[in-house]
């Protein structure tokens, strides 16, 4: 990571305050039958230019277990449950090891088809995977969602992402050996790139994920959101960056080859706030005329994985692109 960027980003994050009374853990509906179990941990130890993960609680089993016991997962129709911390769920700095095991025991035997854990690739070890398999079982479908953002090293440096590609692929193969599926985050909207360069970077990255990662790996494509107390917001304030159009995200989706259309999902396309976002202030730009239509399209795309259907609705919405993007 860049020392200057990292230092300045950590200064910004110190100004982020969690609202008094915020639960240490909460169950949040994402979309359809996907839910997140969110833990207000002490904050990510990395320093991406677009993230505003601040400093929350130094979690312990004694602090979290009583709150977990108030959540009845069996009463909710959940297809996928995402385990998320304020950065990385497998980070022992954020989720102490005994708490990690307690959470696994809590979600086990709840008849949840898919359990996903969002974490930094450097937090994944064979020991942790073995514990996950021991507690959740060999037949449970388990995914890790990993930050990646771009296959291009120069673009990752703009994001201040600390990734070694060789090590990243080694971790991916480790996960494959234990039957852990991967969801790889791909980000649209890198600062200092043109719109065309931003789109092409995402297409190149999706191609890398599909061709170089283990079979069955999926990408998660999402447009960048400008949040308070981030370097991205600072760059906007001094006039060197502005939020992308929601139609740029549609254009990216429309240009993806049909053979890849069932290899990714989408996220963060519109207004979405929870205890962890600290207030997203700018999601992709739209106008009043097209906003509702776009939000409906994104939900439809998110909920349907059939490539032919996705291509159909992409062709339809791109053919009626709003004047606000022309």
Enumerate the predicted regions with their spans:
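N-terminal pre-triad scaffold of radical SAM enzymes
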Residues: 8-57, 72-84, 219
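Core AdoMet radical
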Residues: 54-71, 75-96, 110-125, 140-168, ...
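Acidic (Asp/Glu)-rich catalytic clusters
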Residues: 71-76, 103-110, 130-141, 172-179, ...
